[in-house]
Swiss-Prot record:
It catalyses: (4aS,6R)-4a-hydroxy-L-erythro-5,6,7,8-tetrahydrobiopterin = (6R)-L-erythro-6,7-dihydrobiopterin + H2O. Belongs to the pterin-4-alpha-carbinolamine dehydratase family. This is Putative pterin-4-alpha-carbinolamine dehydratase. Keywords: Lyase. InterPro entries: PCD_sf (IPR036428), Pterin-4-alpha-carb_dehyd (IPR050376), Pterin_deHydtase (IPR001533). It comes from Pseudomonas paraeruginosa (strain DSM 24068 / PA7) (Pseudomonas aeruginosa (strain PA7)).
Length: 118
């Protein structure tokens, strides 16, 4: 468990700061299995989780939906047979905010107990 899993998201307005170049490697070390993807010039955190079937993948997707609603911060979710791709970024600032790292860490926590993981 990391400090990120214990933190809560804060409201993120359009003028909120992006994660700084100094903060980025420190935060990434706390979520080592996540990748940074850049789409349309926007940095995003992304990770693929594998499952034994669609039912387990869908249950995981719904669990991520629950924690997202609780924190008011929502990912991109692609649910396929045996696979869920989770992508975190802050839409309002078009990039990465500390909230994204908090939710990536929380996603990993949910995955630890998710049924049907490969």
């Amino acid at each position: 468990m990391t400090a990120l899993t214990q933190a809560h998201c804060e409201a993120c307005r359009a003028d909120a700061p992006h994660v700084s170049d100094e903060e980025l490697p420190v935060l990434l070390r706390q979520i080592p299995d996540w990748n940074i993807e850049v789409r349309d010039g926007i940095m995003q955190l992304e990770k693929v989780y594998l499952f034994k079937n669609f039912r387990h993948a869908l249950a995981f997707t719904n669990a991520i939906g629950e924690i997202s609603e609780a924190e008011g911060h929502h990912p991109g979710l692609l649910t396929e047979w045996g696979k869920v791709t989770v992508t975190w970024w802050s839409h309002s600032i078009k990039g990465l905010h500390r909230n994204d790292f908090i939710m990536a860490a929380r996603t990993d926590e949910v995955a630890k107990t998710a049924e049907g993981r490969k």
